[in-house]
């Protein structure tokens, strides 16, 4: 991901009938993104995503649910074996931008709701609305907007500074 050094994001590339697609739960466009040597796009509104050729692979642009500007990540490898996937997964346990604070995202009708950095964000085709939350309100948002069980929410540690 942009702004974070090293390899820090994993995506799934699939081949169907000789065509390659990106299927990425983090970007969450809800549709597969065709990957070709031309610029491609998929999704609409808050779910839109696009890819452009970059070096031997692609740069994928997406809408972050809590930030105004588009963000990107670069596809740097393909046909990665399971041993490499598991090793990268294990490395994120100690080195990830998501280890120090809570982040939740959910696609909803008309947009994306997100809880990040002590605020509730909602992105739709018109932009982003943001509501700062008191620490005591975060649990209620997780329960009401995201469907987290209360018994899980009460066990979450506070965000690190």
Regions found by a protein language model. Name each.
Residues 1-6, 14-17, 27-161:
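Mixed-charge, low-complexity segments
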Residues 21-22:
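A glycine-rich helix N-cap at a beta->alpha junction
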Residues 9:
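Histidine-centered active-site/metal-ligand motif
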């Amino acid at each position: 991901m942009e702004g974070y050094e090293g390899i820090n994001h994993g995506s799934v590339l699939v081949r169907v009938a000789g065509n390659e697609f990106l299927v990425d739960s983090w970007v969450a466009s809800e549709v597969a993104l065709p990957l070709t040597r031309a610029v491609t796009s998929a999704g609409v509104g808050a779910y839109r995503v696009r890819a452009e050729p970059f070096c031997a692979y692609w740069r994928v642009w997406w809408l972050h649910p809590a930030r105004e500007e588009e963000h990107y990540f670069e596809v740097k490898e393909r046909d990665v074996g399971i041993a490499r996937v598991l090793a990268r997964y294990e490395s994120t346990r100690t080195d990830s931008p998501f280890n120090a604070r809570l982040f939740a995202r959910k696609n909803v009708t008309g947009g994306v709701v997100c809880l990040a950095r002590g605020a509730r964000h909602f992105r739709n085709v018109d932009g982003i609305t943001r509501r700062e939350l008191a620490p005591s309100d975060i649990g209620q948002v997780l329960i009401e907007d995201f469907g987290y069980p209360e018994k899980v929410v009460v066990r979450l540690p506070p965000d690190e500074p």
